[in-house]
Amino acid sequence: MSGKGPAIGIDLGTTYSCVGVFQHGKVEIIANDQGNRTTPSYVAFTDTERLIGDAAKNQVAMNPTNTIFDAKRLIGRKYDDPTVQSDMKHWPFRVVNEGGKPKVQVEYKGEMKTFFPEEISSMVLTKMKEIAEAYLGKKVETAVITVPAYFNDSQRQATKDAGTITGLNVMRIINEPTAAAIAYGLDKKGTRAGEKNVLIFDLGGGTFDVSILTIEDGIFEVKSTAGDTHLGGEDFDNRMVNRFVEEFKGKHKRDNAGNKRAVRRLRTACERARRTLSSSTQASIEIDSLFEGIDFYTSITRARFEELNADLFRGTLEPVEKALRDAKLDKGQIQEIVLVGGSTRIPKIQKLLQDFFNGKELNKSINPDEAVAYGAAVQAAILMGDKSENVQDLLLLDVTPLSLGIETAGGVMTALIKRNTTIPTKQTQTFTTYSDNQSSVLVQVYEGERAMTKDNNLLGKFDLTGIPPAPRGVPQIEVTFDIDANGILNVSAVDKSTGKENKITITNDKGRLSKDDIDRMVQEAEKYKAEDEANRDRVGAKNSLESYTYNMKQTVEDEKLKGKISDQDKQKVLDKCQEVISSLDRNQMAEKEEYEHKQKELEKLCNPIVTKLYQGAGGAGAGGSGGPTIEEVD
């Protein structure tokens, strides 16, 4: 691979991921080795190998407990987080608790292994990086990665860590709607005049985000964000799955709900049906031998699908109303509505949204699956100093999704940075002691919108000690909140009289990985990658031996060559070929060297015989090489 490639933009999605690059003045969304422009965010572990992307998703029905998806729902969260606990009920794979952090447990090559969500996400990112490298023919080292607008600090940090484990320099973590707005801003560049309010409606496979941005003179500013971390195509599929499990029970008096493989196959068929129903009014489901040998054939109309999900579809308008309230805008003040995420293709959702905005046209000009990666690729080019005129006058302002503050007397939340403040930002406020001769203060940092800290989320805390004795209210303690462009928070406190300072970067208290953890994971990621490559080479050597063996067998058995070869030679070749075929059947897992050694032995025996044979047959083509290699068919 020659030279250093450009920076890439990665949309690391809950269910699918997408990668783009900005070059030659335009964005290119890159297809993977299967020709798909989005790649499932799935990682599977088997007895012999690790699979990522389409290959992992395609075998999920056979291997549900060792196929990991939805890592984005775990990343940066604690094990006892209520959302983690409720998600665990629905996942076929095991999640275990290690020091308060969730880890997924799988069986890999016959051993029990556990992985942090960051490691699983890093495997998906590695796949996306490789997709880009294969297309560009260059090493890729830098990237911009996107996250949902209301990911908190630890979720952003953990996503950045996943990039680091992959070996990427993550220049910036940006919000998904901001990325979509950039993509959109470029698309609509020629027509801009004055300030525009844009609503971004992003309904993906697993999450739903609504954001309102203003765009003026190339400056994007996020005004508000709202949404539901648990709404998307998967939920619509689940409604169909439940419906069909009941139908199967009714028709066949059998309950297949407890059979993971049957449910998984049913879910895959439902996902296909949902996609079909966006363009057709009816979809059929045909699954052979779904459960206990019974075939399941049924169909679903678009109207029935809409009825099953009526409450969920209608529910998408609540976050729209909340985002409008937060941005202090009336729905009539929204100039543009942008659709992002595959589920926005559902006609009913488009209709509900259009009716809510009194028939306003929706923007569907960008492929909804690709808009976020598109914007991330543009942002990567800007940060790398791309001088192309298409990106020159774009500036990007992001916001903090939640208010940040400290606890003051009586458990009151005192916010220093209000939610939806443009970042980077720095705010300072002076506090004092609560009792006489108080020698230390505890600074507790919270995020959230409630009046009392007990209802908000504790990010971290530290003590400022050594305050000289004084009556209450006299010491002056200056607290500073500083958020950088990635949304990462530093909090410091200084005692004005002594100049004593203490500070915290909000990371570890939220279960962030330590530097040692990350370094170890980087090494492990490299080890797994090397194992994957060794396995590919091993399979290649096995296929080569197999194809050469069958080739030789065919050659000496060829009717046309009868009489050109002595029976003794023919028997020699056939015996040796049979010996190789038997050993291949017995041991599918031999080392590459063993396969190569067997092939050399076989060639040593066959080459002189084949050469004689073809000379005898008037040089009917050289057969002495390794025989044709067989291309893999997926």
UniProtKB/Swiss-Prot annotation:
Name of the protein in its database record: Heat shock 70 kDa protein
**What's the source species for this entry?**
Gallus gallus (Chicken)
What is the similarity comment for this entry?
Belongs to the heat shock protein 70 family.
Query: Which keywords accompany this UniProt record?
Result: ATP-binding, Nucleotide-binding, Stress response
Q: What is the lineage of its organism?
A: Eukaryota, Metazoa, Chordata, Craniata, Vertebrata
Q: What does this protein do?
A: Molecular chaperone implicated in a wide variety of cellular processes, including protection of the proteome from stress, folding and transport of newly synthesized polypeptides, activation of proteolysis of misfolded proteins and the formation and dissociation of protein complexes. Plays a pivotal role in the protein quality control system, ensuring the correct folding of proteins, the re-folding of misfolded proteins and controlling the targeting of proteins for subsequent degradation. This is achieved through cycles of ATP binding, ATP hydrolysis and ADP release, mediated by co-chaperones.
Q: Name one GO cellular component term.
A: nucleus
Region entry Nucleotide-binding domain (NBD), spans: 3-389
- Give any single GO term for biological process: protein refolding
GO MF entry, a single one: ATP hydrolysis activity
Cited SUPFAM superfamilies: Actin-like ATPase domain, Heat shock protein 70kD (HSP70), C-terminal subdomain, Heat shock protein 70kD (HSP70), peptide-binding domain
Instruction: Specify the superkingdom.
Output: Eukaryota
| Record note on domains | The N-terminal nucleotide binding domain (NBD) (also known as the ATPase domain) is responsible for binding and hydrolyzing ATP. The C-terminal substrate-binding domain (SBD) (also known as peptide-binding domain) binds to the client/substrate proteins. The two domains are allosterically coupled so that, when ATP is bound to the NBD, the SBD binds relatively weakly to clients. When ADP is bound in the NBD, a conformational change enhances the affinity of the SBD for client proteins.
Stretches the record annotates as Substrate-binding domain (SBD): 397-512
